[in-house]
UniProtKB/Swiss-Prot annotation:
It comes from the Eukaryota. Belongs to the ERT1/acuK family. Residues 1-71, 176-228, 274-312, 539-567 are annotated as: Disordered. The keyword Secreted does not apply. PANTHER family: TRANSCRIPTION ACTIVATOR OF GLUCONEOGENESIS ERT1, ZN(II)2CYS6 TRANSCRIPTION FACTOR (EUROFUNG)-RELATED. This is Transcription activator of gluconeogenesis UREG_00958. PROSITE patterns: ZN2_CY6_FUNGAL_2. The lineage of its organism: Eukaryota, Fungi, Dikarya, Ascomycota, Pezizomycotina.
Amino acid sequence: MTSNARNGPLPPNPLANSGNNRDISADITMAEQVVRPESQTQVENSSTKQPNGQTKPMSASNAKDPLRPRRKKAKRACFACQRAHLTCGDERPCQRCIKRGIQNSCHDGVRKKAKYLHDAPNEALMPHLQGQLYTQTNAVRNNMSLTSNGSNSKTNFYPRQNSNFNGYYATKNDGSLSQSQLHDAGRPDTFPSQSPVSPTFSITANSATSGNQNMPSSLPASNGNASGQAQNGFGSAFFDPCDPALFNFDLASMNFGNHYGALEFGMLGHMATGAGDTPPSDSATQHGSVGRNGSGTFAPGSNFGESPTAQPSFLFGDPTIAGDWSSSVHTRNIYNQNMNHMSETPHAFAIESGPANFASPNSIESPLLTNSATFDDNTTSAYQNRSSMNPMPPQRQPVVSTPQLKHLQLSKRRQRNPSAIYESVKEPYSYTTGFHSLTAFIQRRFSTQNTLRIAKALASIRPSFIATTKTLNRDDLIFMEKCFQRTLWEYEDFINACGTPTIVCRRTGEIAAVGKEFSILTGWRKEVLLGKEPNLNINTGGSSGSTSGTSSRGSFTPRAGMEVNPSGRTQPVFLAELLDDESVVEFYEDFAKLAFGDSRGSVMTTCKLLKYKTKADTDMLPGNTGGTGGGDGQSAASGNGHVKVENGMAASNGQAQPLSQPQRRWSRGGIAGEAGMNQLGFKDGKVECSYCWTVKRDVFDIPMLIVMNFLPCI
């Protein structure tokens, strides 16, 4: 047996049948190229060339090489790359679509809308194709409308500027847009949703629509010239809320992925930076001026500006007017008359498309109540039959200026000048005298135990006061008082605007400012609290009687007149005079912790405020042992001391007795208005409240003032 037979059959010769093998391998290679995915082809193409001329496929280590060129991240991928989850570029068409031969269909992919963009139309979110279709279609429509009118230059819509936003969007030639695309883009029925209307309308007696010319103009030519001048002077971008050139928006620097987000961000920034820069003028209110005559049609000369002859204009996007029109039955019919024009611009839902006026007049003085911007039942027929509608002669409407209303409300505030504080303060405030007066009052009113607790609390912060004030000279103390008065000047505006009972006192506890709500709640008048009038209060919250005027240390003598300190100033009321004994002790214990502690800290707890009661008030109240209930000298006190006063009769033990003096009406029922607030705590002289207070320091880190807010517990 030979070796070949022993070892088995010989392997096939590689050179044998070389032609057949070559054909089979070629077919396999062609099939692999057809079936092979594009990603594998890209891997083979991304090969590195060796020095000997051979190619070597890129390995995983080379793919992660930090020195390899990185592809720039695109702002938005095209539709094909987005569906294939591949990296795309900013250019259109992208390189991948060019390699695949589908560059003609390369366009931006559709992103998932954010929640706050659900109400926005899809066309406004397309930064490339649809955005330019919107802009260019609107320009073509406006040009066609202007040329069709001929000599009649009066139109309801002002033309907008053709802005392609080259700084942000990829430029596209105008010739690449076919006429069918422009026609389809201008049709409102091709859009899935309608955007809120925000173009500017100029309502004049001889206004003519640009879509149809069924309504003839029959007024003199002088009005037409005036309207034409107004159009030339205020046309294009001035009244267009969707044009970024209106507010000098640089959309490229905002780095937004869509037109809508960039305009919204720019509008918010414009409102935030220019809120206080607009001076109160008549031109600032003309965007919200609406008037109507007796027939239900809008007529000129009925705006609320100071000039009755000014050209009236209004915005459909104005929220103050849209609120009145939202309840109208025929609102949809009115809008449909010019819906073709309204759907052309990529509305960005601008909050304000004109100069904003932040005046907020009272509801009874609002111009929208004096001249209602509503339509009667014949409005629809009047718009449909325009050929039969003749211009009505303008009727003079009452002129109400919003800046004048704003001036009436803020006239008192504008008269205040903080410069007067720096000119009037010439002497430092004597806090030493204030602390001495506080010590004398505490020893006179409180018991020995409570006085000791208050003294310990004040003694704990006394070294800190000495350390912070020992290096201050006279000029520093004067500057400290100026800082206090300047800060108090700001807090007074806050107190007047806030409806919460509020008081502001110095670190000594002397009242420096008070709100009218606090006076209503407690009965303490502002003049009494500030020391401008005598303090005749005898209510100290003692346990021996509700209003007997006694305390734990015996009788408390009220101030017969305005107490004058040795420094020559009147003595304001101390905070300790407004609270009961336990509340005062708790306050000073908390004040010792917060005075030099957390500069931003606050304390929230409960307290009992003392009502302001004089001897005359005590005598007027039936049920008090020292009071008189009627003119016959008999006491009108009931067994439990609960007496209800109604209609000048004191009901005691089921019997009504006439009262000789005016009585305070109080009951355990509901609370309404100032009278109801005044009833709180009138029986026992205490009002249970929850209050929050904080300490504000000056530039020397010394407690300067204490701000306290109260809310009664009802």
